[in-house]
Structure formats: C-alpha cells, structure tokens
Amino acid sequence: MAKLIPLYQYAGQDLGIMGLGKSGMATARALAGTGTRVHAWDDSPILRDAARAESVPLCDLTDQTSRTSPWPALQGVVWSPGIPHTFPQPHPVAVIAHERGVPLFCDIDLLARARQDCFFLGITGTNGKSTTTALIGHILKAARHPVQVGGNLGTPALSFEPLPFHGTYVLELSSYQLELVPSLCCDVAVLLNITPDHLARHGGMDGYIAAKRQIFRCGPRPGVAVVCIDDEPSLAIHDALCRENGRKVVAVSTRALPRGGVGAVDGQLVDATQGRPRAVADLTTIATLPGAHNWQNAAAAYAACRQHGIDAKIIVEAMASFPGLPHRQELVAEIDGVRFINDSKATNADAADKALRCYDTVYWIAGGQPKEGGIVSLEPHFHRMRQAYLIGQAAPAFERTLKGKVPLSQVGTLTRAVTEAAKAAWRDAIPGAVVLLSPACASWDQFSSFEHRGDIFRELVADLAHTRAAAKPGGRR
C-alpha cells in the first residue's frame, strides 16, 4: 500500500468531509488511522455506498438537529471544490457551516498545512493550466528534483506519496479550489490568463477574477509571481502585484518581450529576467506545443522553473522531450492526407480559438453543453472552416451564429460528426486539411467528461482508419 501524506496534526479533532468523489475519498483515506474523528457525507447514495465499503464513517451533515450531530464539535469541513458553497446557490451544508462559523477548506489546504517543509508551485488560468502544470513537472523530473504533480490535474493532493524535505509539489489550481486554500502559500505562483468562465459559480466576472487572484495570497513571505500579461484582467493583477512590497513579479508575453520578463513572440523564447535579453529556444520546433497559446504555456513554465532554480539548458532540453497531454490538440491519426485532432479539452470559446488559429483548412466539430457567450468571439476564424458539424445542446445556438457565414450541419452526435467530416475532407482533398474536435462547450450533455468525449473521438477515428485500410486493394477485411 502506498504511503500517504501524514495528517496526525488532526488527531483528536472532528473534521467533516463533504463530497466523496476522488478528492473526498483521498482525504478520508489520508485521515484514517490518524486519530481524527471523521464525519463524511455525499448527496449521492452510490458514492456513499462506495465510501461505506471502505469503512469511511458516514454522517448526514445536512442534519444539525440530531442528538448525535457532529456540528457542535466540528473544527472544519474538507469541502469538495465542485460543490457550490456560495454561488449560484450554496449547498445546505455550506449554509450550516457559515451560520456556525465552521471553516471550509479543500484537500489541497490540508496538504499545504502538513508539508510546510516542501516547495509549492501553483498554476492557474482559464486555459492552459493542465499543460503548463504537466510541463513544469516534466522539467523538474528531468532536473532530478523530487516532485509530485496533480491537484486539479489527475492525482488528488492527498493521494500523493510524501516527498522528502524540500521536495516540490506542482499543483494545477482551479478557481473552485483557490477559494478553499487559506493556508496555501506558493513559492512560485503562475497565472496564465483570465477569460470569462464559470461565471454563475463565482457570481460574475469580478468574483471569478478574485478567485484566480487568490493564488497570490500569502503570508509574510510572498513567493514569486509569474504573470502572463496578454489579457486585461491578468495585466491588472500583474500591475497590482508590482506595487506590493517584497513581491518579485515576472511578466510573460507572446506579444512583446516584457521588461525584465520572458517573451515568446512568434514562438521565439527570450529571457530578459537577468537584464540583457537572451534567446533561449525556438518553440516552433516542439511538435507537442503547437500554437501561440502553447508558447505562452511554455514561456510561463520556463519562467517558473528558472525562478525555482533550474538551469535554462535543462529546461529547454526537457521541453523538447515533453510528450504533451491527451485531449489538448492531440494528433490522433493522419488518414489519407487528413489529420484528426482531438482537442476535447477546449470547453469554452477561448480554448477553441487557440486551436483554430493553428490550422487553415478545418472541418470543425463543435457543440455540447453551452458556455456563456457562445462562439461569437470565434468569427475571425470562420474563414478557416470548410464546414462545421454541430452536436449537443449548443447546436441550435451555434447554428444561429454561423448561418450564412460557414457551411454547417446539425448532426446531433459525435459519431455522425466524425463520419461526415471525414467524408467531406477526403472528398475535397485539400492539402493540410484537419478534422478538429474543439467543441467550445462542456461535455456533460452527452458524455461523462471531456476525457470521455475525447476517448470516443479516438475510437471513432480508429474505426475510420481500419475501415479505410480494409477498403483499399489488398487491404485486410
């Protein structure tokens, strides 16, 4: 059995756990055997049954009137970030906690309290944070630093194996998590970008920006702030941080080389943090980091790792071997001159914009559970689209935006979209053609997650490749 983060400082205390998904169960496992009195709950009977099977102590936290209610003794509630605690409507357990003055925090906060002897690198942003987090982890591993990578990306914080003294935790931090980490002080904190997303959950754009800014909240020893300044909200945060005493701020941009910062204009990575600008790498040669958005991710990762003490040569060599992440402009296959790109992680228009910029002849598969703002912002890329194939709940709204500007089909399902897009691309036989799944929508209307959506796309493309090969003279049937 893997070792878990030691949480013995909670021995003898009562802690609630609200939400028994991946992070909640990891918390329950980490607290087991520490002498902490755990009171766990989830609204889902299925998740409660799974927790019960692991002997997790269950208690209905929505009931504060029972004689056995733990509320009078609770020191805090470890909160699953996906459960609303303020907007649009706070969960009843959050209301009770607020009325009783019981603090809410997430699993990452427990990690931060338990491992004050380690370094923390935190990454947030509307888009690009998973790639940047994985890239930083890849670089630190190449530099032979003891490191664990996770948070919002993959591994829950309390599923990490304990690192040695001065090891480094590299954490992807969502806006939901950043509202619940009062103890986290990042030694290097990275903000990539801010565009409208999750607005209902944060009560509007101001609340969303405020949540993102929490990554720079710290105690008397502020860490280094790495801020990409290519959007107005991020630039405003950068300027405010520069006015703080004792705070080192490194600006990053793909539009121009910031004074004393790091630039990636046209994919040319340049470091001016030591004064005189120095060319570092040509990012356009790294196939797993295509496009200006990935150059921003790479520049931010470079800046963060340099501030963490990693040599520039090691960083650049590690970037060249970065394998990339699935569902982020992932080349699934090239079949008879047509590339099939899985960008299922593009769950909003800004993310889809980043992918569309990279290709000139696009058969675009889009739609799903719509996000606020739709796809009006993508009009500068409509000329790249040979045809749009619309799926899911957003299809009618997307059709209204595209009609008369882009040839389109409301196909309903991903299966039909892939089939029809492939047929059209092969028929047209235009060099450089791409069938691009970049939905600009969440996936939950038809899939369990963006990963599920991307996996189905992969399977459909594999079926196409098999069928196409079998149909050729001499092909296997």
From Swiss-Prot:
Organism from which the protein derives: Rhodospirillum rubrum (strain ATCC 11170 / ATH 1.1.1 / DSM 467 / LMG 4362 / NCIMB 8255 / S1)
Subcellular location: Cytoplasm
UniProt key word Oxidoreductase: no
Family: Belongs to the MurCDEF family.
GO terms (BP aspect): cell division; cell wall organization; peptidoglycan biosynthetic process; regulation of cell shape
Name of the protein this chain belongs to: UDP-N-acetylmuramoylalanine--D-glutamate ligase
Reactions catalysed, as given in the entry: UDP-N-acetyl-alpha-D-muramoyl-L-alanine + D-glutamate + ATP = UDP-N-acetyl-alpha-D-muramoyl-L-alanyl-D-glutamate + ADP + phosphate + H(+)
Record keywords: ATP-binding, Cell cycle, Cell division, Cell shape, Cell wall biogenesis/degradation, Cytoplasm, Ligase, Nucleotide-binding, Peptidoglycan synthesis
Main subcellular localisation: cytoplasm
EC primary class: ligase
Any one GO molecular function term: UDP-N-acetylmuramoylalanine-D-glutamate ligase activity
Keyword Ligase included in the entry's annotation: yes
EC number(s) from the headed UniProt entry: 6.3.2.9
HAMAP family referenced in this protein's UniProt entry, alphabetically: MurD (MF_00639)
Biological role: Cell wall formation. Catalyzes the addition of glutamate to the nucleotide precursor UDP-N-acetylmuramoyl-L-alanine (UMA).
Positions that bind ATP: 125-131
Stored InterPro entries: Mur-like_cat_sf, Mur_ligase_C_dom_sf, Mur_ligase_cen, MurD
Gene3D superfamilies on file: Mur ligase, C-terminal domain, Mur-like, catalytic domain, NAD(P)-binding Rossmann-like Domain
GO CC annotation terms, alphabetical: cytoplasm
Pathway info: Cell wall biogenesis; peptidoglycan biosynthesis
Name of encoding gene: murD
